[in-house]
Regions:
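Alpha-helical transmembrane segments of multi-pass membrane proteins, especially transporters
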Residues: 22-30, 48-56, 74, 78-82, ...
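A cytosolic-side transmembrane-helix exit/cap motif
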Residues: 12, 43-49, 69-73, 93-103
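Membrane-interface helix caps of multi-pass small-molecule transporters
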Residues: 11, 35, 40, 58-69, ...
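Membrane-helix interface segments
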Residues: 20, 41-47, 74-75, 141
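Helix-loop-helix "hairpin" substructures at the membrane interface of multi-pass membrane proteins
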Residues: 44-52, 58-63, 67, 115-181
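Small-residue-rich segments of transmembrane alpha-helices in multi-pass membrane proteins
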Residues: 1, 30-34, 80-89, 157
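Transmembrane helix-bundle core of multi-pass membrane transporters
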Residues: 75-139, 165-167
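Single transmembrane alpha-helix segments in multi-pass membrane proteins
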Residues: 1-41, 65-72
Length: 181
């Protein structure tokens, strides 16, 4: 799963920013999903995975909005949200550990399931790597992320909205962090 986190960070770094809150985003998204699984055991695992990615997307969008609209440097924003997200984890969990006994068997077995000799999580990573590669090399968004990283001023003259592209990079980073959670 580290490769998925690295891809999210790559999108942000290529846009001349940094996201220090990825681990906290992962932890908060994971905590929300774990508590959801414990409280609502009838929710299927794929829905929980979508919930995790969506939670991460919202947290990444929060970072992106602060960087884009308020113009706060990314290192300051993500250092602050790192602490905020960690605090939210503590508040949501009530300061307690979440026990694996509270989870459904299908949720716990997700990491142990294998297809063609590879763990299911490895297949997820392979699919994300392929999708990320295609996005970065074959779409206008991918080229825009590269362009603003090379020269933001020239990117503006080329018609690229630098702030919006950075916002999307933070959303991608957040979504991938949440998915890993």
């Amino acid at each position: 799963m580290l490769i998925i986190l690295a891809l999210g960070q790559m999108a942000v770094i290529l846009s001349r920013s940094i996201d220090l809150s990825m681990a906290s985003n992962l932890a908060l998204s994971g905590m929300i999903v774990a508590l959801t699984n414990a409280a609502f055991p009838w929710v299927p695992v794929p829905a929980l995975m979508v919930l995790a990615a969506f939670c991460g997307l919202i947290l990444g969008a929060f970072n992106g909005i602060l960087v884009w609209l308020l113009g706060i440097p990314a290192i300051v924003v993500t250092l602050g949200t790192l602490t905020i997200f960690r605090g939210l984890i503590f508040v949501i969990a009530g300061g307690q550990w979440v026990n694996a006994d509270a989870f459904t068997p299908s949720f716990v077995q997700l990491t142990r399931y294998e297809i063609l000799g590879l763990p299911l999580l490895s297949w997820y990573a392979i699919l994300v790597v392929i999708g990320f590669y295609l996005m970065m090399t074959r779409t206008p968004l991918g080229r825009a992320i590269y362009a603003i990283g090379v020269n933001p001023n020239a990117s503006v003259y080329a018609g690229i909205d630098v702030g919006r592209t950075k916002f999307i990079a933070f959303c991608i980073s957040g979504m991938l962090s949440g998915f890993c959670g």
